[in-house]
Amino acid sequence: ICLLKLSGENYELTESIAINLAKYLLSFCEKKNWKLIGPAPSLIAKVGKKFRWQILIHGPEGTKIPLPDRSILWKLIPKNVFLTIDVNPAEL
């Protein structure tokens, strides 16, 4: 399991980036038989001034998480939207 968490002060921008990132990651997941769930607002959708979205990817145990090189991921995310990648998250 891998949880990608996005946050930003602009709701529409953060939502749009989450949607675009999920679309981009879908092909990586499908090739490796992983499932992509989301994006969806986090359970607590706003903390302070930041809106939070998440994407969950889940796949066969013992297989490598199908993410592109991180330098490519960072190019997809504008500076005012933050991405956190949580492998084997303790909480969803």
List where the protein language model places each region:
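Accessory helical-bundle/CTD segments and flexible terminal tails appended to RecA-like ATPase motors
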Residues: 1-92
